[in-house]
């Protein structure tokens, strides 16, 4: 299944939670979810008891859409997490958090992961001094992530940094905003990653 490219705010209304897909609009309280906090449709979707499988699928979809990964990428990451020693769900979240596009977003250089992905694919990002244009590139502890020189005054990046002042920066990155670079200091602990996803249901889904 390809990466979702449809109306992103409909996804948030479908799931009833913010997936950080519309950064500035969400912060301003102007997102579709803020205005219409019910599922898309004339009267919204009817509420009913969701099955166990439905719940598992829902959590997987939320994680996929939030991090902007395809089904193939998601399955590959889950398989890697399952092979490692430790809590599979926590390891999965850590692997998702280590994606370069996500790290650029977490450092506050983009208001959404989607824009962060564009920055990466268009060649605006350096990793340890080398240009990397692969959004799924895995960032390891100690890596330096930097905006290329000619893009440091990009108005969208500047605006993202300004908005970050309202939300703050996560604890596992150190950022020099004025110099437009940051250090991915470590993998996050699960309790530090505030996302509306219960990964245990994803583990149950793929463990069948």
UniProtKB/Swiss-Prot annotation:
Keywords annotated in UniProt: Ribonucleoprotein, Ribosomal protein, RNA-binding, rRNA-binding
InterPro entries: Ribosomal_uS4 (IPR022801), Ribosomal_uS4_bac-type (IPR005709), Ribosomal_uS4_CS (IPR018079), Ribosomal_uS4_N (IPR001912), S4_RNA-bd (IPR002942), S4_RNA-bd_sf (IPR036986)
One matching Pfam family: Ribosomal_S4
Domain of life from the UniProt record: Bacteria
GO cellular component: small ribosomal subunit
PROSITE patterns documented for this protein: RIBOSOMAL_S4, S4
Stored SUPFAM superfamilies: Alpha-L RNA-binding motif
An individual GO BP term: translation
UniProt-recorded Gene Ontology molecular function terms: rRNA binding; structural constituent of ribosome
Ranges for domain S4 RNA-binding: 98-163
Function summary: One of the primary rRNA binding proteins, it binds directly to 16S rRNA where it nucleates assembly of the body of the 30S subunit. With S5 and S12 plays an important role in translational accuracy.
UniProt subunit comment: Part of the 30S ribosomal subunit. Contacts protein S5. The interaction surface between S4 and S5 is involved in control of translational fidelity.
HAMAP family (UniProt xref): Ribosomal_uS4_B
Family of the protein in this entry: Belongs to the universal ribosomal protein uS4 family.
UniProt name for this protein: Small ribosomal subunit protein uS4
Origin species: Campylobacter jejuni (strain RM1221)
